[in-house]
Amino acid sequence: MTAIVTFLGSGTSHGVPMIGCTCDVCQSTDPRDRRSRPSIHINVEDGPSILVDTSTDLRQQVLTNRIARVDAILFTHSHADHVMGLDDVRRFNVMQGGAIPAFADERTAGDLRRTFSYIFNPSTEMGGGIPQIALTTITGPFNIGAVRIQPVPLFHGQRPILGYRLGTFAYLTDCNRLPDEAWPLLEGLDILVLDALRHKAHPTHFTVSEALAVAERVKPRQTYFTHMCHKLGHAETNASLPAGVELAYDGLELTIDAGDKWT
């Protein structure tokens, strides 16, 4: 079962270029240095169209990448850059004629219900329309159609969040530590996508060197770093990385095996 993964956004909560910054990366003419807020789209062949997070930039990301359908949404956590595009999902409700399933851990589901109370409160007046979201709390592996989804526990600072594995592909953003139980879930990967914010230490994100250490332990065929800030220029940083490791960029497409033969 093959799928196409598209990086809708590979930047931080600020995005790149960052407002008011005149550094070399923020002024770069390399399109790979223009990073919107973090999200990916997974389009499974003859299967579901899956969003991972609804970023602040979702509307433009969907238009740029010509996404015509969303069958499910996976949330990693509830920080603004990962959820604040949720209202834009309502256009897919209109086109598809029904609610869209969404999946999140217990804390994130609670945060979504509070932050978007107008969506989840049935007494809210419709006005110009509200998203229809069928929100499920994740308690373990689950299926979206024929696609097996394996949640991967992560830490974003002290906060537990989720990454996801589909087949031989894993997406681990916004993390600075993997608990012991996460490592066995990453065995046999072909492609690993991993948070790598910058070179300087950060309390809630992997640095480039820390992310390289994780990749060395997991040993996928290929690793892509995401959630990069303006301290990492694409061309310069990419040239310094070892074989089998690259920076992702907005619009990058990967072909993955989304089957469940790894379980």
What are these regions (language model features)?
Residues 11, 55, 176, 197, ...:
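Anionic group-transfer/hydrolysis microenvironments
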Residues 151-152, 172-174, 194, 225-226:
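Thr-Gly-centered strand-to-loop micro-motif
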